[in-house]
């Protein structure tokens, strides 16, 4: 062992804190925490133990230094470890990507007529609201909402629509909503539906089934057969749903069960989410190069995982995590109530841990199979594109603009075939006027490579969204900055980055692909074939079918352009390597167009606010910072607008009344009360059918949350 390292170990304090292990180049490779830094760090090098654990031999090979940070308590060390892992991204630490996948349903009981909203599990909890879930996918939450909307008939419209609607939507007519937005629905009656929905979502089936049975019999005895039929349908829906769920624990507690399976340095952590004693969800988290003990790995995982997800009252773990008491304190503080970390050795809870362990092993097998397929795809891509090395770190760049205005660029990053969103970048094009995609790409790629030169880290492959012209613009940027685009002979260690262009497939006439042409009026003039694409090609196809001609429209293949090569490479259709490249390109396009639309909304936001008197540039910016989108300003209450910096009662009222003009008195604007008769019922707004909570609503709600989450992505 190095003398300086030995001296550092001899001087370690016996106090709580964090330690940073560094390699011989000074890079942090592992971050840990301990109640006693001296005992924990020295335990890795205790020769008397005859320690043959893999990570001990690994430390002998690469460790260059150990830095320690003393904290006032073990709890503070847990929190600091999280921050250090995020900052340094050490090679041997657990790192969780921002998990947006968990979804919950929120019901705000403070509202007289509450509704169910789709929210992300990671967002702060609202006081006075109930949360149901988590759900891991839109499809699982969609089925739940379908049953609730059909049989418990809660409103689905936003608060803004609810407060300003004058006529009921079509959901009222199809008996999916009592229309409390328009009619004088008794709050007690609506509250009963809310309580039924809550019991259904919480899995309290015994109480719900008994009450529905009683109300159904009561309605039948009173000859209210329509009500009895509705209650019968509710009862059947509840019973069908409950048939799919099995109670695993009689205590009906909320708990997470954590399983762990390891083979060498690779491991999978499995989390089974149980709510009200039933299995709600199961998720696998695979990790490479986890050489350190399971106790430390599990402690880091739990701290990071429950930073993104709400902790239940009880967490079952296969081994006791390092600094378990401090970790439990941190999780309890985040939850606002006590969280217990248990390692049961026998009984029903130990059986649950065994189930989680088996799921972790199955997740490990599936992950390794997927890993092998990804390695095969990278190897095939390397061969097909004649790359100097497998493209483990790929980036793709795209431009989005509308007639040259608000031009932006995007850069997305994939590592080992998976998105690495921490490395995504957005670019505002600054030095190009008008519609010049080549110049815009030149600017964006130049800025990216300039940053790479400063950091000393280059991707293995840059993919440019476009054809030969776009690729040449990117190559020119690399050349002007002196960045090599192929390995230097005799200097294998020198950095370089390879570039390719990926051109989208196009809808073309079959002659372009060497087959029969489209025959229509446009193609009969002199028998000459023409290249058709987009709307023109579709028009030809429709015309040909109308006149009985055979249409041979086809799609050109995706083409990959390589530097110094005239003809593009055409990858095998439906191959894994083509799918990987197309997925990377499509993600760059999505990221670019999302940013472009955001800038357009901001511009529209500014132009709309121009019409409000007394709102200057400073207050416009304050509104935009506070609400983020014009839609949210429109939906905000007067009190919420008053909380924006720089807004007094006068300015807040001006903004609120601009979007919510006071309703005029009169027949048209008068409130409608009482159950409507067939003759007196207001017209149904059939266009409002979209207000039902459907797949599109869920996807839109989650897209809005994703857009908000991507907002902090660096803009260069």
Curated annotation (Swiss-Prot):
* Gene Ontology terms for molecular function: DNA binding; excinuclease ABC activity
Q: Which UniProt keywords apply?
A: Cytoplasm, DNA damage, DNA excision, DNA repair, Excision nuclease, SOS response
InterPro entries this protein is in?
DisA/LigA_HHH (IPR041663), GIY-YIG_endonuc (IPR000305), GIY-YIG_endonuc_sf (IPR035901), GIY-YIG_UvrC_Cho (IPR047296), Hlx-hairpin-Hlx_DNA-bd_motif (IPR003583), RuvA_2-like (IPR010994), UVR_dom (IPR001943), UVR_dom_sf (IPR036876)
- Where does this protein reside within or beyond the cell? Cytoplasm
- Name the major location: cytoplasm
A biological process from GO:
SOS response
The chain positions of domain GIY-YIG read 14-94
Query: Pfam families in the record, alphabetically?
Result: GIY-YIG, HHH_2, UVR, UvrC_RNaseH, UvrC_RNaseH_dom
Q: Which GO terms describe its cellular component?
A: cytoplasm; excinuclease repair complex
**Domain UVR: start-end pairs:** 206-241
- PANTHER family, alphabetically? UVRABC SYSTEM PROTEIN C (PTHR30562:SF1), UVRC/OXIDOREDUCTASE (PTHR30562)
Q: What does this protein do?
A: The UvrABC repair system catalyzes the recognition and processing of DNA lesions. UvrC both incises the 5' and 3' sides of the lesion. The N-terminal half is responsible for the 3' incision and the C-terminal half is responsible for the 5' incision.
The similarity comment for this entry is: Belongs to the UvrC family.
The protein's name is UvrABC system protein C
This protein's species is Anaeromyxobacter sp. (strain Fw109-5)
By which gene is this protein encoded? uvrC
